[in-house]
Every structure is written in C-alpha cells, then in structure tokens.
Amino acid sequence: MASLMEVRDMLALQGRMEAKQLSARLRTPQPLIDAMLERMEAMGKVVRISETSEGCLSGSCKSCPEGKAACQQEWWALR
C-alpha cells in the first residue's frame, strides 16, 4: 500500500499522471489513490488537470456508451 509521500514522489518523477497509472505503478487500489490525490489537492500539494480529447473522430459522444467521460482525461501534477 502506498503512502502520500510515495504518490508525491511518483508525480515528481513522472511529471503528470492519471490516477489509474498511479494505481498500477504503486500497486494500490484506485479508490485509495483517488482519496489520496483529493487530500493532497486540498492541502495544495497537487493540481488536477482536465483535458478534453480532440481526437474523437466520429464526433458522436452522445451515442457512445461512456459518453463524454471517455473523451475527457484527468491528469495530476505537483503544484
């Protein structure tokens, strides 16, 4: 199980990462990583970066089973 310091160190080494990448690299359940990142965001240590993918070739997000959530990526980086 990862600690807040290990999450911080991984972000420092990689620059920015998605929560699922952190979860896989640190071998920690994603709900725990999500909670740690939200806590670190509240402490002002990390920042959430939301990006909308422009690569949706069909432009039919309304009919996509995942909806627009599949086109939107959420990254985390140190502040």
UniProtKB/Swiss-Prot annotation:
Pfam families: FeoC
The family this protein is said to belong to: Belongs to the FeoC family.
Positions annotated to bind iron-sulfur cluster: C56, C61, C64, C71
UniProt KW keywords: DNA-binding, Iron, Iron-sulfur, Metal-binding, Repressor, Transcription, Transcription regulation
GO MF term list: DNA binding; iron ion binding; iron-sulfur cluster binding
Protein's recorded name: Probable [Fe-S]-dependent transcriptional repressor
Gene that encodes it: feoC
Disulfide bond in keyword set: no
Protein role: May function as a transcriptional regulator that controls feoABC expression.
Residue stretches in coiled coil: none
